[in-house]
Amino acid sequence: MSTAIESPSELRIGILLFNWIVAVFLMMSPQARAQVPRSEPTVAGAMVLRVATFNAAMNRKSAGELTEGLQKGDPQAAKIAEILRAVSPDVFLLNEIDYDERSAEVFLNRYLSSQERQDSQEPTEQPPWKYFFAGPVNTGVDSGLDLDGNGKMHEPNDAWGFGTYPGQYGMAVFSRHEIQKEAIRTFQNFRWSRMPGALRPMRSNPGSTELESYYPDAVWDQLRLSSKSHWDVPILIGGKTLHLIASHPTPPVFDGPEDRNGCRNHDEIRLLMDYVAGDSSGAYVVDDNGRTGPLATDASFVIAGDLNSDPIDGDGRAEAIRKLLEHPRLAKSPAPKSLGGVEASENSKGANLKHQADPATDTGDFNDRNPGNLRIDFVLPSANLKVLASGVYWPSKSQSAEANALVGASDHRLVWVDLQWEQLKQ
């Protein structure tokens, strides 16, 4: 973390600049920001619960840099907050917000605070977000092993999850409703080899026609499955509990013919599926406190996150995400869509021209040459929840030129789902 001390004049300038940035975004009309209207419940006494996921791309080059920038005033973070304010989810997961025990709290207090909301003078806005959870992740945590086999240790590829410092590419959950922190289950330390039938990466053996393991046994037995972590975050809403199942699997690229990242991405998604399956397939799961077993069969849950796998296009092992999307424990509903995704695909060249999926379902605006725009961010409710509406926050220029420019704060787009939540009667 940087130890540089700013002069009082530099600090005042930074604060004034930050306040100006926030004021500009708050002065944008709801129409300019393309606010997303909330659905109406179909059952008397029920509430509408909006759940979202958003890879905010708020990762930085060095430890502590994000928090330091947030305290000074960060233009990207102000845009991310404005997107969140336009969609106004009750519960949301942020991927790629660096973890250092302070960043999530600073972002909440300085960019999503009730004071800013009061200043906006928009009576249609929902109550403020009060609760958050941010925990340690595997990215940047040195394994002490030569994981990539290049004869060197202590490099980014030798961390339990790729990263240059602990907490890079972290994640956090924010909520208007109470997070039951004492009941959170995390799976940061779960070992890949503990998964039955794990996709162990293999490579050719120059002295044999048979394949050999890319990772030696001594390394394989220690490898952690989660590139960041997997979380089960219980949230108390109207007397009932919603489990937000959060993760951010590794991209299935940046490797070699052994496809070690593709295998890992597949099994990180499989862990989600096994955990919520409601049968013996998740019996092997053990959390960081030593508690074994999957989620209860009668639980209401939402799987959320940048899963880095498109079911149709891209370079991943699509069978895992396809199985997850088709799982009987998940609600059957159309994929969230946007007009901006269609517009972006029509205006781009390269890989998008060869894609087979509906561009309206894309959730990321990536390199036109490769991989092109993809659907890799998901909000997947359990089958015992009624889906009222869903969408990808990606306004077209014709809908709102201002909002279309705003979403460029990240290469991912926020995905949201409206659920009917029937509260317990008092």
Predicted regions and their residues:
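Glycine-rich, aromatic-lined ligand/substrate-binding cores of catalytic
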Residues: 244, 249-251, 259-265
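Bacterial N-terminal signal peptides
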Residues: 16-28
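Sec-exported extracytoplasmic/periplasmic mature domains
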Residues: 85-89, 97, 102, 106-116, ...
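N-terminal, active-site-proximal structural segment of metallo-dependent hydrolase catalytic domains
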Residues: 32-173, 200-224, 238-242, 255-257, ...
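Sequence/structural signature of beta-propeller domains
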Residues: 73-75, 139-140, 162, 204, ...
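A surface/extracellular/periplasmic glyco- and lipid-processing/surface-interacting theme
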Residues: 180-242, 281-286
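N-terminal secretory signal peptides that target proteins for export/translocation
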Residues: 1-14
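Metal-dependent phosphoester-hydrolase catalytic domains
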Residues: 35-36, 178-186, 190-196, 234-236, ...
